[in-house]
Amino acid sequence: MMTPEAPLDDNTLKGVTTTMKRVIVGTLALLMVISAIALADGVGAFSAFKNGIGARALAMGGAFVAVGDDATAMVWNPAGLAQLNDTRLGGMSTDLFGLGITHQFVGAVTTFANFGIGLGWERASVAGQVVDEEGEAGDAFTWTEQAILGTLATNIMDIGLAGANVKYYMADSGLGDTADGFGFDLGLLVNLGDIFAVGVTATDLAGTTISWAGGATDVVSGLYKAGMAMKLVDGMLILAADMDFDGTNLGDAHVGMEFNIIKELALRGGVVLTNSFQDYYFAVGAGINVAGLYVDAAYILEETLGNTLILSAEFSLGDLLGGGEEVGTE
């Protein structure tokens, strides 16, 4: 994850007080834990944010770049907001791997003229405790990472959809160190008739620099995705697949499906292939919707790190007020 202090040479260490040594040891221990348990590449700042958001998408194994038809599209593929025609409010909460790492998201999207507009807030945090060189516990603290993102999407001459995010990152070590930085995402989505769709995204283009108040810097690594989706049986069945790329090497592969047994009930499943397709883990989930209220749950079966339960809810104000048509299948 992040490094809140610049490296200390031997002369500096000799002058550090016992209290500061406890802070340094405790902070480094926490950083090692967070880096080890993060999904995806698991390296770099804001690693937990690479997991994605929303129980619906995560239950499909994260294969959502070419789907992107709900409020979480602002993270998965900002271009997807241009295919909505109502106002939506959504949120997500989870404890990653059951290890006390909280990951939350709240967002709102709407349409204006030919544009899709979104505003979201994402947060990840973990509580820790300073430990001195003798192993004795000291002060408790909470490491927090947040991002505020604004999304704009539009239709490009009826050829496809394009979208972009501007993100403001903030980090707080809980020990008096803070950092921030701006990042940018781009997304494209092309519907090939009523059945096929393809999408590509570039998140944190060229890497996002996070600057600490003390002068140190960290980087949110760039991540690039390409995906395709098929909508069958009048949109009641969705099959999707995504591929990750870090700019140098291929990353994880994501395959997922969603089947609406009836309009009000959907079942989902997916698989994520990791480590050059040598390892994998599964995801399952379900969702219900009643009069524009969508409630979704996902369960990530990650044997090594631990299982994760994700809960999400989304309101479609257009549906509730009778003012919009349903575009995506939730």
Residue ranges and their predicted role:
Residues 1-47, 319-330:
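Cleavable N-terminal export/targeting peptides
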Residues 41-330:
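Subset of outer-membrane beta-barrel
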